[in-house]
Amino acid sequence: MVSDIKSTRNAVVTGTAGIALAVARRLVSDGFFVILCGNDPEQNAAARSSLGDQHAQVVELDVSDADAVERFAADLGHRLDGLDALVNCAAIQPYGTIETTTPADWQKVVGINLTGYYLMSHFLYPLLKSRGNASVVNFASVQGHLNQNNVLGYATTKGAIHAFTRAMAVDCAKDGVRVNSVSPGSIRTPLLEFAARSLTPEGGNLEDTIKEFGKSHSIGRVGTTEEVAALVSYLVGPESGFCIGGDFPIDGGLRAKLNV
C-alpha cells in the first residue's frame, strides 16, 4: 500500500525497470512525487534503492489483476486529492508466432500490455479527472506500426494501444484529461539487452549486437531511456497542452529508413 503523500504534483508510473525507471527519475526531477508500480520483487527493490523514498514510492502491483488495481486506486484515493499524470509503461515481450504462441502466453501478454493499461486508467480516472488538467501517456511501440518476426502477442498489444489511446483521448478531453501514446524504437533497456544476448553468437560481443540493432535506425544507434523520459516529461507538462490523441514516435528514424 501507498504511505502518506504530501505533494502538489503526483504521478503513477507502471513498470519498475528500463524506461519506466528513467521516466520516474525524470518526473521526480521535474517536481513530481512518483508512485512506481511493478510485480517483480528484484526490480522493485532495485528501483526503490535507486529512487530513495523522499520523492517516490515503489509499490508491488500486478497491473493485470483487476482486484489488486482497484484496491490500489482506492487506497490512493484516500491519500490524494488528485493525480496529475499516469504513465502506462509496464510490458512484457514474449516471442512466438500464431503457431507457437500458447493460449496461456497470449492471455499473459494481453493481460499486462493491454488490459493493465485499461485497468490502471479505469480505476485511477476519478483522480485524474478531479485535476482538470491531467495527462495519460500510454507506451506503444514502433511494432504497433511495423513488425518483426516472432512477436505476435507483443505487436498485437502495441497496435491495440494506438487505438485505445485515440478512443480514450476523444472521451477524456472534455474532462481536461489529455491522452497520448509514445512509440519507441530500439532503446537500451534490460529487455533489449535480453534480446541482444539471445542473438549474440557464442563467444560474440553483446555490444556489437546492440550496434547492429542501431544500424537499422537513421541515426545509426539505439536510443537511451533518458531520451524517452524527456519526451514523457514534455507530454505530461503544460507545454504540450494542445497534444491530444497523438502517437509520438521516438525511434531514431527507424520507420523513416527503408532498409534495402
Residue ranges and their predicted role:
Residues 3-35:
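Canonical Rossmann dinucleotide-binding motif of NAD(H)/NADP(H)-dependent dehydrogenases/reductases
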Residues 87, 173, 178, 243-245:
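Short, small/polar-rich loop/turn modules that mediate ligand/substrate recognition or access, typified
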Residues 97-98, 105-110, 213:
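Substrate-binding pocket helix/loop in short-chain dehydrogenase/reductase
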Residues 121, 157, 165:
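Active-site helix of classical SDR
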Residues 126, 170-174, 241:
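Alpha-helical segment proximal to the catalytic Tyr-Lys
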Residues 141:
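Residue(s) in the substrate-gating loop at a strand-loop-helix junction
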Residues 146, 233, 244-260:
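Short C-terminal tail/terminal secondary-structure segment
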